[in-house]
A protein has these predicted regions:
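Hydrophobic alpha-helical segments, principally membrane-spanning helices and signal/leader peptides
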Residues: 1-2, 297, 377
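A surface/extracellular/periplasmic glyco- and lipid-processing/surface-interacting theme
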Residues: 47-93, 98-367
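Bacterial lipoprotein signal-peptidase II cleavage site
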Residues: 18-27
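Positively charged n-region of N-terminal signal peptides that target proteins for export
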Residues: 1-9
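Ser/Thr/Gly/Pro-rich low-complexity, disordered linker/stalk segments of secreted
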Residues: 29-47, 365-391
Length: 391
């Protein structure tokens, strides 16, 4: 019996040792893993390069125009045609200058790129006026004492290249112009050198670059089609002064978006390149005109006036103003809003108020109609139905 009790005590002891003390419960701790936050990175934005508009032709440029406008006289009588590089002018203005003589003045924003221009003729008071309005350096082939005194009185910078080119011992003077006697005879064979006249002007102390930006009166739009306009594929501009008249015709080329210049029954094409003379913008300005005692016509631009404007095959009546002797022409719609021109070259006819403008639209092309052929119909063949016999 004692042995049994002892055995039970041993077993109890062993069982208690196997259980041992209960370990304290440990709560599982989960460390929050924080994802590293990345700051949003913004790509550096590049400011678009500023764009500028050429004030004479509306072309877009990355730099402003700070040059000097140059102007030159261009003969426009039949004996002087065809022109040489008149098509390179940003603006061509045509007018009667005395009696029945019609001439042009061309305005160039960078005449240094044009090797030859002409033929060039003598200046007139109206050319002097226009050069003053645009602060242009005027080149011409002499002029009467009255015209030259008038140019000096206007304070314009002007050069008589007919005199300068003869100074063969002075390369700068001699390089301003040249005569091409194979081209034309007499007074119609003097041609201005664009690079030559710029170099000579610079040698005379005339600043031709890095000038303050200037307002030349024109505004431009990507699409210069005038509002409240009529279709005008053919425009006949008739300049008149008293009993004298001269007709210019502009034919619209819809594919090119330009008007081609016709006069004296011929299309105007360049003597050297044979390319037609074309314009994106066509303008008629009606201006009060009088005649000085020596026979020169003068225009009174300061009151402003009316006219017409055409672009992209459409034409509309306009008004225009000129605020002073040194102010450019400004153009407006008939309602008085600023008139945007289309980017490109501009032709301006200057006429007394007796001048006229007529225009016509092309007849729309009617597509040829072909007789519809009715296809022959064949009668459908009804298949024979197989007789079914009852089994």
């Amino acid at each position: 019996m004692k042995k049994l009790i002892a055995l039970l005590l041993v077993l109890a002891t062993l069982l208690g040792g196997c259980g041992g003390a209960a370990e304290p419960a440990t709560e599982a701790t989960t460390e929050a893993t924080t994802e590293p936050t990345t700051e949003p990175t913004t790509e550096p934005t590049t400011e678009p390069a500023p764009t500028y508009v050429n004030p004479l032709n509306g072309e877009i440029s990355e730099i402003p125009y700070t040059g000097r406008v140059f102007a030159t006289t261009i003969s426009n009588v039949p004996a002087a045609l065809p022109h040489v590089n008149a098509k390179e002018a940003d603006i061509i203005m045509e007018m009667f200058v005395n009696s029945s003589v019609v001439r042009c003045i061309g305005l160039f924003h960078d005449i240094s790129k044009v090797d030859a221009i002409g033929s060039t003729r003598s200046t007139r008071p109206m050319f002097n006026d226009i050069a003053e309005h645009y602060d242009a350096v005027l080149s011409h082939a002499g002029g009467t004492n009255t015209a030259l005194v008038n140019a000096n009185e206007h304070g314009i910078t002007h050069y008589n290249v007919d005199s300068l080119y003869r100074k063969v011992d002075d390369p700068l003077k001699a390089g301003t112009a040249y005569r091409d006697k194979e081209y034309k005879h007499g007074e119609h064979n003097l041609f201005l050198s664009g690079p030559g006249i710029v170099a000579y002007a610079q040698s005379e102390g005339i600043q031709t670059t890095d000038l303050p930006e200037r307002d030349y009166g024109l505004i431009f739009a990507e699409d210069g089609t005038p509002i409240n306009s009529e279709a005008a594929d053919t425009i006949v501009l008739q300049m008149k002064y008293k009993s004298t008249k001269k007709e210019t015709v502009m034919e619209y080329d819809a594919e090119a978006g330009t008007y081609t210049w016709w006069q004296y029954g011929e299309m105007m094409a360049d003597q050297i390149t044979e390319e037609p003379e074309t314009f994106e913008n066509v303008v008629m300005m009606f201006v009060p005109m009088t005649t000085m005692k020596h026979g020169y016509h003068v225009a009174d631009f300061l009151p402003g006036g009316t006219g017409y404007y055409a672009c992209n095959g459409r034409l509309t009546p306009i008004t225009w103003t000129c605020a002073g002797d040194k102010e450019p022409f400004r153009f407006f719609t008939a309602e008085g809003d600023p008139l945007p021109f289309g980017a490109g070259k501009t032709y301006i006819a200057i006429s007394s108020p007796e001048g006229t403008v007529e225009w016509t639209a092309k007849e729309p092309e009617v597509p040829e109609t072909t007789e519809a052929t009715v296809p022959e119909t064949t009668a459908a063949t009804v298949p024979e139905t197989a007789e079914t016999t009852a089994p």
